[in-house]
Amino acid sequence: IWGIGCNPCVGDEVAALLTRGEA
């Protein structure tokens, strides 16, 4: 998943998408 490990804020955005089932 892009963002994680590079930008914690972006990683949080991706985690939110996963939680919403949109990833």
Curated annotation (Swiss-Prot):
Keyword GTP-binding: no
PTM sites of type (3R,4S)-4-hydroxyisoleucine: I1
Cross-link (Cyclopeptide (Ile-Pro)): I1-P8
GO molecular function terms noted in the UniProt entry: toxin activity
Post-translational modification: Processed by the macrocyclase-peptidase enzyme POPB to yield a toxic cyclic decapeptide. POPB first removes 10 residues from the N-terminus. Conformational trapping of the remaining peptide forces the enzyme to release this intermediate rather than proceed to macrocyclization. The enzyme rebinds the remaining peptide in a different conformation and catalyzes macrocyclization of the N-terminal 8 residues.
Crosslinked residue numbers (2'-cysteinyl-6'-hydroxytryptophan sulfoxide (Trp-Cys)): W2-C6
Residues cleaved off as propeptide: 9-23
Keywords: Hydroxylation, Thioether bond, Toxin
Record PTM (3R,4R)-4,5-dihydroxyisoleucine, positions in chain: I1
Keyword match Ribosomal protein: no
Family: Belongs to the MSDIN fungal toxin family.
Function text: Major toxin belonging to the bicyclic octapeptides amatoxins that acts by binding non-competitively to RNA polymerase II and greatly slowing the elongation of transcripts from target promoters.
Miscellaneous note of the record: The typical symptoms of amatoxin poisoning are gastro-intestinal distress beginning 6-12 hours after ingestion, a remission phase lasting 12-24 hours, and progressive loss of liver function culminating in death within 3-5 days. One of the few effective treatments is liver transplantation.
Protein name: Alpha-amanitin proprotein
Originating organism: Amanita phalloides (Death cap)
Lineage of the species this protein comes from: Eukaryota, Fungi, Dikarya, Basidiomycota, Agaricomycotina
